Structure formats: structure tokens, C-alpha cells
């Protein structure tokens, strides 16, 4: 086999999993991390990371890639290219495709399409119930054997407590995480957050209690099963939900030792998305449909509670909930348009704006929430989420000082539904390395001794669709 080598030099390497934060080099050989330390005479390709952060490849455990069935919005290829443009080397795709991702064949299809694109690694999250209808459990065992890394009915929560109880038990048997879309639909289902503004706009409101009730129920179900299944609350938005998770985790820490668990490795976790950290329901005031999402944007008090939840460790994972829709769909009236926005490409800089620059978290915490913690959540921690020797050679290089403007028309994604268009952000991807190969490097002058790579998101999308991203 022909040896491939890439040395990333002169950067500040931060690997939260191993407690490394140092100016040093890293050598990648044949798709694996081979060496960390100063290299005087590098062999093969060299990337000059001067002034940059060198981090484990970012992992997004919550994206929607729409294939099969809704390819006009996104495909696995364009979504994986969008991930690379945003610095993500691994993504986990949700099962609300058409048909739902609820069979072994569907799981295998995702891997096949991702391999063909040659961009980010894509791992499927299988549907917990057949057709995501919340009634009958799917064939979790077969999907897990085929490579599904978790289960969810995302887009809806499992309404029946009995069915959810079964889902948790079967997830425990497969050793996979259960991810819950926390919404009691009998209370939810509105167009935006319930409050004075929804009443003023004449839009059906969606109260916080719809989210809080399901979180409370699920934590009780989990504890009743002695936390046998790893439970994860998706895209959290409410102050009440954060407090419920905080209390549940504190109770788990007391229960853990007697149950044989490590109190530091929580069996209850949650995630937040960038839009819920930076936007409020006030954005809906002009009926801009790019502010309609599920769960909805909440109040500033809720945003502050989410940020506190990140600061105190209640929230362990950051995930984009990348949800593409066509321009035609988003051109309908606010009440009719589908929920969701795209987020993979601006996410890193948005998290920096919300959490890093204000001092809520350190670089180490931010990167742990974007890599190591996600890897552990979906069981990929042996080879991903860190830069230990022998780990997969997935690396994200970040230029913390670069200021850029969000331009949705330059995205790799097929869709353009993003409320951050025109925002000026500080911090950008300098390179995305997948399996030891530089897939994206906006400043080509930093890379020497290698074949030309994509320098634009559009170039990434083209390569992915042509199958030339390898």
C-alpha cells in the first residue's frame, strides 16, 4: 500500500480527551494519527497551521440530510460537503427521510452514499419506531448490527410512555443511545413560541411546557430502568428543561456508584443548537420564515438559561440540527412553511460568538462539546473525537482571528434557509482533514506537497456530487 503522510505544523494543538494544549506538530499517516511532537523534516504533504488551532475533527450528532426522498433539499453528498465546509469530519443523520430510516437496508444505503461522496463520515441514527409513527418498535438490533449509532424518532417525540419505555429498553440491549425530540404534541405543534408576540402576530403558540413535560417523563423512565440506556435530549430550548436535566443528572450522580456506573460518565445528557443560543422569538416579528424552527426560538430568559446550562456542564454536546428546505417551501406563509434552518457551515463561528468570545467556555470546553463528547455519545470514542496515536486522522484546523461574512449563496448545501445570512463572524475553518486527506483549505498557500484541494464550499459540493472527493 502506498504510504500517505500529512504533517500539520506550527499550530496550537488542543485535544480535550488527552488534556493536550500545546504548540506542536501532528503527523498523519495512512488515515491514522501517527505522531504528536515537533517535526524538523516532515515527509509528504505539509499544512502550515501558524496562528491556528489544531483540533480533533468536529462531530455533529444531529443533522438532516434528506436522502432518500427529499433530494431537492439536500443529499448525503451535498450534506457531507456542507459538513466539511463547516469543519465537521463526522455527522450523524436523523431518520426522518422518506421513507423513514427504519431498516437495515436504509442504514446500509447511508454508508454507501457517504462513501461514494468521499467527504465527511456519515453515520445513521435509526428510527426508534417503524415509520417514525410512535407505535411499534423498529428492528433496532438489525440496524445496530449494520452500523446505526443511535436511535430516535426525531421530528417528533414518542408520545406513548409505554412505547418510549420499550424503546429505552431495546436501546439498552443494543448499547446505543436514545435521542429524544422532546415535545408533547398535544401541547406543542404551534408555529412559534407561545407568548405575547405569537398572540400579536396571530400565530399559534408553542409553550415551554410541551418540551418540559417530555423531558421530565423521560428522566423518570430512565431512572426507573436504572439508567440502562444512555438518554439524550435533543435541541433543548427551555429554562425549565435545563433545570430538569440538571436535577436529573445530580440524582444520577448519587445513584451511579450503587448501579456500577461512573458518576462522571452521565447516562443523561442534552444538546443545544447555535440558533437557540443566539436568537429569540423576537426574530419572528417580521414573519421571516427562516426564524421558524422546531423546537421554536424562545425568550431571552430561556437563552440565558441555555448558556448557564453550558457553563455549568449540564449541557455536554453542541449539535446544529441542520435542516435544509427549498426556497419554494420557505416562501409560503409563516404558518404553513416547514420548520428548520441549515447550520453546518456557520456553526463553528456561531458557537464561538455565543460561548467562546464572551468567556462562557474555554477552547478546551468548546472543542470537547464539538468532538469528544459527541464521539462518546454515539460510541465512536475509540477512533474519533480525539487525536491519540492510532485514532482516525480526522482534524479540524481553525483560524480564530479570521473575520468573514455569512453568505448563504456560497454554501455547499443545496438549501439556503439560514437566518444568519449577512452576519459578520470571527473565527473560520482553515482546513478540514478527513481520514488523513485535506478536503478543504480556503487558503491553498498553507498546503504544500499535496494535490490541489477544494478552496470553496461550492468546489466541495461539486466534488461530492461527482464522487471525486476521495
Where are the regions that the model predicts?
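Active-site mouth loops of central-metabolism enzymes
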Residues: 61-74, 97, 123-136, 202-208
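C-terminal cap of metal-dependent C-N hydrolases
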Residues: 11, 333-336, 389-456
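Divalent metal-coordination and catalytic microenvironments
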Residues: 11, 26, 31, 51, ...
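Histidine/acidic residue-rich metal-binding segments in metalloenzymes
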Residues: 135-318
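His/Asp/Glu-enriched, well-ordered alpha-helical/loop segment
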Residues: 200-228, 290, 311-312, 316-318, ...
Amino acid at each position: 500500500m502506498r504510504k500517505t503522510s500529512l504533517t500539520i505544523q506550527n499550530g496550537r494543538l488542543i485535544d480535550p480527551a488527552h488534556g493536550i494544549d500545546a504548540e506542536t506538530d501532528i503527523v498523519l499517516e495512512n488515515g491514522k494519527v501517527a505522531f504528536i511532537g515537533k517535526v524538523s523534516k516532515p515527509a509528504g504533504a505539509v499544512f502550515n497551521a501558524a496562528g491556528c488551532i489544531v483540533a480533533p475533527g468536529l462531530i455533529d450528532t444531529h443533522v438532516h440530510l434528506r436522502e432518500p426522498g427529499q433530494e431537492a433539499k439536500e443529499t448525503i453528498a451535498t450534506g457531507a460537503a456542507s459538513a466539511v465546509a463547516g469543519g465537521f469530519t463526522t455527522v450523524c443523520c436523523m431518520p426522518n427521510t422518506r421513507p423513514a430510516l427504519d431498516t437495515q437496508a436504509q442504514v446500509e444505503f447511508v454508508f454507501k452514499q457517504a462513501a461514494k461522496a468521499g467527504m465527511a463520515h456519515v453515520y445513521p441514527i435509526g428510527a426508534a419506531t417503524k415509520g417514525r409513527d410512535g407505535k411499534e418498535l423498529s428492528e433496532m438490533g438489525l440496524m445496530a448490527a449494520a452500523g446505526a449509532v443511535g436511535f430516535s424518532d426525531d421530528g417528533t417525540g414518542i408520545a406513548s410512555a409505554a412505547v418510549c419505555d420499550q424503546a429505552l429498553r431495546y436501546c439498552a440491549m443494543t448499547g446505543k443511545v436514545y435521542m429524544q425530540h422532546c415535545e408533547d404534541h398535544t401541547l406543542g405543534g404551534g408555529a412559534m413560541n407561545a407568548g405575547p408576540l405569537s398572540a400579536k402576530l396571530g400565530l399559534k403558540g408553542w409553550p415551554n411546557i410541551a418540551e418540559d413535560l417530555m423531558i421530565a417523563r423521560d428522566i423518570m423512565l430512565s431512572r426507573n430502568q436504572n439508567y440502562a440506556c444512555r438518554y439524550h435530549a435533543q435541541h433543548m430550548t427551555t429554562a425549565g428543561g435545563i433545570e430538569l436535566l440538571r436535577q436529573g443528572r445530580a440524582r444520577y450522580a448519587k445513584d451511579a456508584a450503587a448501579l456500577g456506573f461512573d458518576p462522571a460518565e452521565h447516562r443523561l445528557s442534552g444538546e443545544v443548537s447555535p440558533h437557540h443560543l443566539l436568537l429569540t422569538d423576537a426574530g419572528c416579528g417580521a414573519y421571516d420564515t427562516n426564524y421558524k424552527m422546531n423546537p421554536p426560538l424562545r425568550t431571552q430568559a430561556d437563552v440565558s438559561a441555555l448558556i448557564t446550562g453550558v457553563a455549568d456542564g449540564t449541557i455536554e454536546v453542541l449539535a446544529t440540527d441542520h435542516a435544509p428546505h427549498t426556497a419554494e417551501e420557505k416562501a409560503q406563509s409563516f404558518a404553513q412553511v416547514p420548520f428548520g434552518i441549515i447550520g453546518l457551515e456557520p456553526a463553528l463561528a456561531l458557537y464561538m460568538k455565543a460561548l467562546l468570545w464572551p468567556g462562557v467556555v474555554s477552547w478546551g470546553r468548546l472543542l470537547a462539546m464539538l468532538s469528544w463528547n459527541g464521539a462518546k455519545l454515539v460510541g465512536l470514542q475509540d477512533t474519533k473525537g480525539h487525536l491519540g496515536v492510532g485514532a482516525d486522522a480526522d482534524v479540524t484546523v481553525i483560524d480564530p482571528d479570521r473575520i468573514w461574512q455569512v453568505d448563504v449563496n456560497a454554501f455547499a448545501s443545496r438549501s439556503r434557509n439560514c437566518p444568519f445570512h449577512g452576519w459578520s463572524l470571527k473565527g473560520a475553518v482553515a482546513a478540514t482533514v478527513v481520514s488523513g486527506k485535506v478536503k478543504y483549505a480556503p487558503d491553498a498557500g498553507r498546503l504544500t506537497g499535496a494535490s490541489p484541494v477544494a478552496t470553496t464550499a461550492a468546489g466541495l459540493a461539486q466534488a461530492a456530487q461527482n464522487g471525486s472527493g476521495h
